[in-house]
């Protein structure tokens, strides 16, 4: 069992001496009672007890855990002390003793009387500002298994430079009064049950070097200012932090930083390359993603680099060869592709390289387990290496390998944005070009259509209403045909996860879910064809300028009755229909821009006035164009009129639906590959043990 989850067991021996053997019922009762008593002592602090302690702390804490300046004068003490600082320490320690709920080893049993320097776990030393004055310089209660909370009175011990409480059962928050401990040098509250936001009191300590919050329940964001402190060790692992890793990480002079087992998101900051003193960096088991920044290769002093169980994508940067001091590299449990470079496995000090549970399709000769570097522990299982055993299936590999990631466009690796968004933008551009070519073969019909319309716009109202009357019929047919393929897409999307056998992946596939957003970029190509009908209409909207004259007359009001029948499906299938309904009116300005091309072919309009015959075939294409506006424009006009102004950025509207659909499809992939047969133990290989009491000048 991991050391941080050990139940603190304490045995008890019950001796039952009785003159007469008890009856079986009485014996059973006594044995049962003794079992309950011993089991109660053996278990760690329950949630109910923890809640009770937290409630006690909240009832005793002043506002925000701050202390009034005259608190020491509010305590009537009959004992005498060598100096005022020891008196203040006595007040603080007595308040702390009252806040203790359980002390199984009786560690604080001798916390009585004014001689605080004799208390167990209390360290005294000459004051830094006056060597003739003895003060409480530190508290060391590591491993005492004490349950309780921290009272605000602890802020009275302003000479404390060392505060070690690891491996206890303290609950509640870190009081704000700790800001007064300006001499704090080492602060270790790891392996307890503290809660609340990040304890910002650390930001007020000018000389703190060691900061350890491991194995607690702190949550929220980590302030960027933390990495601007002159800290040598920063332990944040195994909490509930959810923020991104600040870019200020590169300003930290720390030699050890751990982010493991939280919920950090975003990228590894590119500033990491500025951490010249860094020896160990652990990102394991978070929600980090994107490509690895090439700046990692500047960490020439790093011995441990662990980025396992995240959502990193793309190829390994060639700059990794700059990790000349590295001994252990763990990048398993991601979505990395490409090759494992030969020169990475040739690093002089490398002892362990784990790149299992990725999608690598090739590896250098020295990276093959049992190859030329037999002294190195290598793990390449569950990749896409054709010649190696225990690899992923071809179908499983195709899901990721067929969607390569260009890290030069990835924001985490220095690109302007992720490749997923630009790709849909580029895809629509060719789509409108194709409709432009389509009008060219039939320029005569659209040209003939506008020619009569402009010549007699007022005279045509009568035929115009007739055409809309004919249009609803095809309109009703076309929308029905278009929703059918739309649902077919979602139906087809769930199939791949069923086909892809990923149930044996022991790693949390949530990273895979998160990272499928970039790969969809190439997949977004299918959606554009689905939405391509809307793009072609815009060129067709070049005629609509005259058609806009019909919209003003409420001739199109008849269509609304049928559309309501079809309006439910669009919202059911996807929001794009309502999104595209505004675009036609919004795109109406662009058509005038595109209308210049029609005017060029407008030279042909005058000749054939027999446009009425062609319009029927031409009306068949327009129905898709006109049907959406009449069918959906009423809903948009009546229900959300303000939406059109918000959607004044139509060009971007086409891409958003695609990413949205892709983000929904990945969850389909995510649930499939879930399996917990193989459990990765927590990272305990490199323990930064709490240092002994400080041996610096004055203490």
From Swiss-Prot:
Residues 1-39 form the signal peptide. One of its GO terms (molecular function) is structural constituent of cell wall. It comes from the Eukaryota. InterPro entries: Leu-rich_rpt, LRR_dom_sf, LRR_extensin-like_regulator. Glycans are attached at residues 106, 301, 352. Keywords: Cell wall, Cell wall biogenesis/degradation, Glycoprotein, Hydroxylation, Leucine-rich repeat, Repeat, Secreted, Signal. Transmembrane segments: none annotated. Hydroxylated on proline residues in the S-P-P-P-P repeat. This is Pollen-specific leucine-rich repeat extensin-like protein 4. It comes from Arabidopsis thaliana (Mouse-ear cress). The lineage of its organism: Eukaryota, Viridiplantae, Streptophyta, Embryophyta, Tracheophyta.
């Amino acid at each position: 069992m991991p050391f941080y989850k050990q139940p603190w067991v304490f045995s008890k021996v019950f001796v039952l001496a009785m003159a007469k053997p008890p009856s079986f019922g009485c014996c059973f009762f006594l044995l049962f009672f003794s079992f309950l008593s011993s089991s109660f002592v053996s278990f760690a602090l329950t949630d109910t007890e923890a809640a009770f302690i937290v409630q006690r702390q909240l009832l005793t804490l002043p506002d925000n855990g701050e202390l009034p300046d005259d608190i020491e004068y509010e305590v009537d003490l009959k004992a005498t002390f060598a100096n005022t600082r020891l008196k203040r320490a006595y007040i603080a320690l007595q308040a702390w003793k009252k806040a203790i709920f359980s002390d199984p080893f009786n560690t604080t049993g001798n916390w009585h009387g004014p001689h605080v320097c004799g208390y167990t776990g209390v360290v005294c030393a000459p004051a830094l500002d006056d060597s003739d004055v003895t003060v409480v310089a530190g508290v060391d209660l590591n491993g005492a298994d004490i349950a309780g909370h921290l009272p605000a009175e602890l802020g009275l011990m302003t000479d404390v430079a060392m505060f070690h409480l690891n491996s206890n059962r303290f609950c509640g928050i870190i009081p704000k009064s700790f800001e007064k401990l300006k001499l704090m040098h080492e602060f270790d509250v790891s392996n307890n049950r503290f809660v609340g936001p990040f304890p910002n009191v650390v930001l007020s300590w000018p000389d703190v070097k060691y900061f350890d919050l491991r194995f607690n329940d702190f949550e929220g964001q980590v302030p960027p200012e933390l990495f601007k402190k002159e800290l040598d060790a920063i332990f944040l692992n195994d909490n509930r932090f959810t923020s991104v890793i600040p870019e200020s990480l590169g300003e930290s002079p720390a030699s050890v930083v751990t982010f493991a087992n939280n919920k950090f998101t975003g990228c590894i900051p590119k500033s990491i390359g500025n951490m010249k003193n860094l020896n160990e960096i652990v990102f394991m088991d978070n929600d980090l993603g994107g490509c690895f920044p090439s700046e990692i290769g500047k960490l020439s002093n790093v011995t441990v680099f662990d980025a396992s169980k995240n959502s990193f994508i793309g190829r390994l940067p060639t700059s990794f060869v700059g990790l000349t001091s590295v001994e252990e590299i763990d990048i398993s449990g991601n979505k990395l592709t490409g090759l494992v470079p030969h020169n990475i496995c040739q690093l002089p000090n490398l002892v362990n390289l784990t790149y299992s549970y990725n999608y690598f399709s090739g590896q250098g000769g020295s990276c093959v387990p049992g190859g030329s570097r037999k002294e190195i522990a290598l793990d390449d299982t569950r990749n896409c290496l054709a010649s190696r055993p225990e690899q992923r299936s071809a179908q499983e590999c195709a899901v990721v390998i067929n969607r390569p990631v260009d890290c030069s466009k990835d924001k985490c690796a220095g690109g302007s944005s992720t490749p997923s968004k630009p790709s849909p933008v580029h895809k629509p551009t060719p789509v409108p070009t194709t409709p432009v070519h389509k009008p060219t073969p039939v320029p005569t019909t659209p040209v003939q259509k506008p020619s009569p319309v402009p010549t007699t716009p007022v005279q045509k109202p009568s035929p115009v209403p007739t055409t809309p009357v004919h249009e609803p019929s095809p309109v009703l047919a076309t929308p029905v045909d278009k929703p059918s393929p739309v649902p077919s897409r979602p139906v087809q999307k769930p199939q791949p996860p069923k086909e892809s056998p990923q149930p044996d992946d022991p790693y949390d596939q949530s990273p895979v879910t998160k990272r499928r957003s970039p790969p969809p970029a190439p997949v977004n190509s299918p959606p554009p064809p689905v939405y391509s009908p809307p793009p072609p209409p815009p060129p067709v909207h070049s005629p609509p300028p005259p058609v806009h004259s019909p919209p003003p007359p409420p001739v199109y009001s008849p269509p609304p009755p049928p559309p309501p029948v079809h309006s439910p499906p669009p919202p059911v299938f996807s929001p794009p229909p309502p999104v595209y309904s505004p675009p036609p009116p919004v795109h109406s300005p662009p058509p005038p821009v595109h209308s210049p091309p029609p005017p060029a072919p407008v030279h042909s309009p005058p000749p054939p006035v027999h446009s009425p015959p062609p319009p029927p075939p031409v009306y068949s294409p327009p129905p898709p164009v006109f049907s959406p506006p009449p069918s959906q424009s009423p809903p948009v006009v009546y229900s959300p009129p303000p939406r059109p102004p918000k959607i004044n950025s139509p060009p971007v509207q086409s891409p958003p639906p695609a990413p949205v659909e892709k983000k929904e499809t990945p969850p389909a992939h995510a649930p499939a590959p879930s399996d917990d047969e193989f459990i990765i133990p927590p990272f305990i290989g490199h323990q930064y043990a709490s240092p002994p009491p400080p041996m610096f000048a004055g203490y």
